Amino acid sequence: MSLFARQLQSLTASGIRTQQVRLASTEVSFHTKPCKLHKLDNGPNTSVTLNREDALKYYRDMQVIRRMESAAGNLYKEKKIRGFCHLYSGQEACAVGMKAAMTEGDAVITAYRCHGWTWLLGATVTEVLAELTGRVAGNVHGKGGSMHMYTKNFYGGNGIVGAQQPLGAGVALAMKYREQKNVCVTLYGDGAANQGQLFEATNMAKLWDLPVLFVCENNGFGMGTTAERSSASTEYYTRGDYVPGIWVDGMDILAVREATKWAKEYCDSGKGPLMMEMATYRYHGHSMSDPGTSYRTREEIQEVRKTRDPITGFKDRIITSSLATEEELKAIDKEVRKEVDEALKIATSDGVLPPEALYADIYHNTPAQEIRGATIDETIVQPFKTSADVLKSIGRA
């Protein structure tokens, strides 16, 4: 027992009232659920450490994604976002945990739940929300919308189920060709795990030992179909056959971080691809047009929110371990709320690209050329090469 603790004990024994003192921790160890392994002799550590700085950052990052997605859901209901919109609420620990393990030069490619990843890899909250509403301030000036955002080393959302799987292998091939010590994190859902291109991509990746992590974010439902009804084998981490795999608790950010670190080291050592399955859950329907309650009950969703929510669980951990106080986390919540609210103002008021921008951003570094129009007889001369050129022409660089 420390001298400080003995003194407190002595004072209490003497009948003197003492006030509880909580000393802030700087680093704490936690235990995570063991990973399930496929064709591997060992896996990630179950004893992990977390320092105060990282704890506050991870909490803030997950809260930004949660609040940003909530804002997007409201914008869709107000018909300020049109078309498709798939939300990531409930799965925040997957993205933030993986990002925490990535290093400079690592790449990510995913499907249509891409808003959080776009922000994590460099876009601002304003750029994400403004892209969703089709505004100039958007990540790609409003041209991409919900499913087609990108930033440096983020190869986007992809609107076709499973289309990103072979593309991720291609990014990894480029990394190996350039002799980069990096990996491409290729994400897909349990619904896309049955797509033929995944098996083609894993075959080529293993054949050439490409540094690619094939990550299945198993949220239990492919649209409205349960994994058990769509897959003969629901152990997605084993589906690579000759590609080793690990199963991870995707609701635990620390388990995700440690597993991704381990997986990245595996790929960096030249052993080739690895499959990861993140067991997670989405709170909303498949998309905003799906209420998400025809194939599951509201009670099921509430039970997950109550017992497995990634943000609440992490919050409880860092408070009870004295890495942060409840007041500090409330201050972060307030700061995040303000950031998202400010972004919403721009996302709902900024202008849109003029019609001339429709034909920009088609070809890279080429002179103006004729582009086929809506009919075979219609041709249009490309007046601007990029949207930036269009904005410059109207005085908005």
Curated annotation (Swiss-Prot):
CDD domains: TPP_E1_PDC_ADC_BCADC. It catalyses: N(6)-[(R)-lipoyl]-L-lysyl-[protein] + pyruvate + H(+) = N(6)-[(R)-S(8)-acetyldihydrolipoyl]-L-lysyl-[protein] + CO2. Mg(2+) binds at D190, N219. Its EC number is 1.2.4.1. Pfam families: E1_dh. GO terms for molecular function: metal ion binding; pyruvate dehydrogenase (acetyl-transferring) activity. Transmembrane segments: none annotated. The pyruvate dehydrogenase complex catalyzes the overall conversion of pyruvate to acetyl-CoA and CO(2). It contains multiple copies of three enzymatic components: pyruvate dehydrogenase (E1), dihydrolipoamide acetyltransferase (E2) and lipoamide dehydrogenase (E3). This is Probable pyruvate dehydrogenase E1 component subunit alpha, mitochondrial. It comes from Caenorhabditis elegans.
